[in-house]
């Protein structure tokens, strides 16, 4: 089974593209979804995170306050490393399980929706990489609409590898810098490319 990475800069529209691909019966494994699952209430992952960082990162209903924890660790490499040392092995294990499941079902191709594909040096694990790209100003505007502060926006964008580098490293670049009709046409281009990949030995 071909294993395709889907990534992009924050707020470039990767999740929207991921949803569109699902509607075409392409199996998608979502790294963010798995990252939430491995620290859900009652999980061993959540217990380990709280032991490391403290109970102030729990919400009133016992869930992990991901935004509060994110604000603490971003910009502090040693804290981010501690968090990733807990969560990354759990995420990898669950990812492998889902990938095997799709393979056992007979799929020829599956997508792994992973925001930090290049940051985690994972490119070599894939048979192809799709990058969803937009301009920096569009990233900022979309994050403002989600009520992010200017400091949060600057810090998060700065923590990621520049989108231009990701575009250079990609096997396929999908531009999400115009309207929805343009995005639909871009997704059609991706679907054709995936079909070609699927039929390669």
Swiss-Prot record:
List the catalysed reactions.
3'-dephospho-CoA + ATP = ADP + CoA + H(+)
A Pfam family the protein falls into: CoaE
Note the SS bond partners.
none
Q: Which keywords label this protein?
A: ATP-binding, Coenzyme A biosynthesis, Cytoplasm, Kinase, Nucleotide-binding, Transferase
Pinpoint the DPCK domain residues.
Answer: 3-201
Record GO biological process: coenzyme A biosynthetic process
Q: In which pathway does it act?
A: Cofactor biosynthesis; coenzyme A biosynthesis; CoA from (R)-pantothenate: step 5/5
Broad class of the protein's primary localization: cytoplasm
Q: Name one GO cellular component term.
A: cytoplasm
**Where is this gene product found?**
Cytoplasm
Q: Which Gene3D superfamilies match?
A: P-loop containing nucleotide triphosphate hydrolases (3.40.50.300)
E.C. number: 2.7.1.24
Give the top-rank taxon of the lineage listed in the UniProt record for this protein: Bacteria
GO MF: ATP binding; dephospho-CoA kinase activity
What enzyme class is recorded for this protein?
A: transferase
Alphabetical list of InterPro entries matching this protein: Depp_CoAkinase (IPR001977), P-loop_NTPase (IPR027417)
> Which residues make up the binding site for ATP?
11-16
Family listed: Belongs to the CoaE family.
PANTHER family from the entry? BIFUNCTIONAL COENZYME A SYNTHASE-RELATED (PTHR10695:SF46), DEPHOSPHO-COA KINASE-RELATED (PTHR10695)
User: What does the UniProt record say this protein does?
Assistant: Catalyzes the phosphorylation of the 3'-hydroxyl group of dephosphocoenzyme A to form coenzyme A.
Put simply, this protein is called Dephospho-CoA kinase
